[in-house]
């Protein structure tokens, strides 16, 4: 089982909710012969071969697929509003110590780079006072600042999050930033990986959603609302987008068919 240098055990939870308005049965969508959740699990296992990995599910149809492949899973409440709450239930029911680290990897990201997962696990391990951790990369194209589906984050001089928003932050009062500003490290795009101590995860799950979280539909704002620091790891570029719609499925399948990838990072 993976542990940090200070002895803290590392668990990885992959939340997988069957119901999806835009793509019902999303975890089981076929991606070149394998259900998506199986591909996500394989990617995490390849990145962190010694980690304690649990898929947090809410439907017997997912359980059947995972059980047939010998993949560890935990059935969770169907009423959870977020993957954070689903991960918290797994940690609580499993009796993990408060000091253990829990990495939350989204179940709809079948192409998340193994190098990113490894780097993030290392980042969490190197953060002595780990509370909440996440990832961001340069926005790249300045036009993406205006895309509400792209979540932006502003950090302080320590690399801790000041705010997350679907709006353009920081706002440039004197007009649109130059195209080169997209790579200067000031305009950052959030990448939805999370790490916590179990104590922090449980505190987040127990807290009621805050007004900012409900307004922006961004669960990480709950941590900031509660005064919890969020340490942000920098990554050089955005990973391939996840799956939310049938069009996304077609895009990922096309990538898998074309096999335009580094041989060390098979899709």
Curated annotation (Swiss-Prot):
Name the GO terms of the biological process aspect.
Answer: CMP-keto-3-deoxy-D-manno-octulosonic acid biosynthetic process; lipopolysaccharide biosynthetic process
Q: In which pathway does this enzyme or protein participate?
A: Nucleotide-sugar biosynthesis; CMP-3-deoxy-D-manno-octulosonate biosynthesis; CMP-3-deoxy-D-manno-octulosonate from 3-deoxy-D-manno-octulosonate and CTP: step 1/1; Bacterial outer membrane biogenesis; lipopolysaccharide biosynthesis
What is one term from the GO cellular component aspect held by the record? Answer: cytosol
Which transformation does this protein catalyse, written as a reaction?
A: 3-deoxy-alpha-D-manno-oct-2-ulosonate + CTP = CMP-3-deoxy-beta-D-manno-octulosonate + diphosphate
Q: What is its main location?
A: cytoplasm
- Compartments it resides in: Cytoplasm
Query: What GO molecular-function term can you cite, just one?
Result: 3-deoxy-manno-octulosonate cytidylyltransferase activity
- EC id: 2.7.7.38
Q: Tell me which UniProt keywords the record has, alphabetically.
A: Cytoplasm, Lipopolysaccharide biosynthesis, Nucleotidyltransferase, Transferase
Q: Does the keyword Ligase apply?
A: no
The record's HAMAP family line, in alphabetical order, gives: KdsB
The UniProt family comment states: Belongs to the KdsB family.
Q: What does this protein do?
A: Activates KDO (a required 8-carbon sugar) for incorporation into bacterial lipopolysaccharide in Gram-negative bacteria.
Q: What is this protein called?
A: 3-deoxy-manno-octulosonate cytidylyltransferase 2
Report which gene this protein is encoded by: kdsB2
């Amino acid at each position: 089982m993976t542990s940090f240098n200070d002895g803290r055990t590392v668990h990885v939870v992959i939340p997988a909710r069957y119901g999806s308005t835009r793509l019902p049965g999303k975890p089981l969508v076929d991606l070149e012969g394998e259900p998506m959740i199986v591909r996500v699990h394989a990617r995490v296992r390849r990145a962190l071969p010694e980690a304690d990995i649990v898929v947090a599910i809410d439907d017997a149809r997912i359980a059947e697929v995972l059980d047939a492949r010998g993949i560890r899973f935990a059935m969770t409440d169907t009423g959870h509003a977020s993957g954070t709450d689903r991960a918290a239930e797994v940690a609580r029911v499993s009796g993990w110590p408060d000091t253990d680290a829990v990495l939350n990897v989204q179940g709809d990201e079948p192409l998340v780079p193994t190098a990113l997962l490894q780097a993030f696990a290392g980042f969490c391990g190197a953060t002595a006072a780990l509370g909440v951790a996440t990832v961001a990369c340069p926005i790249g194209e300045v036009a993406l600042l205006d895309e509400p589906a792209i979540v932006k984050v502003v950090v302080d001089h320590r690399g801790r999050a000041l705010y997350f928003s679907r709006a353009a932050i920081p706002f440039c009062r004197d007009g649109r930033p130059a195209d080169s500003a997209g790579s200067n490290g000031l305009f950052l795009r959030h990448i939805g990986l999370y790490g916590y101590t179990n104590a922090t995860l449980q505190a987040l799950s127990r807290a009621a959603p805050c007004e900012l979280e409900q307004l922006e539909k961004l669960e990480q704002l709950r941590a900031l609302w509660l005064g919890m620091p969020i340490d942000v790891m920098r990554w050089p570029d955005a990973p391939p987008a996840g799956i939310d719609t049938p069009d996304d499925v077609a895009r990922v399948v096309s990538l898998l068919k074309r096999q335009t990838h580094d041989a060390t990072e098979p899709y």
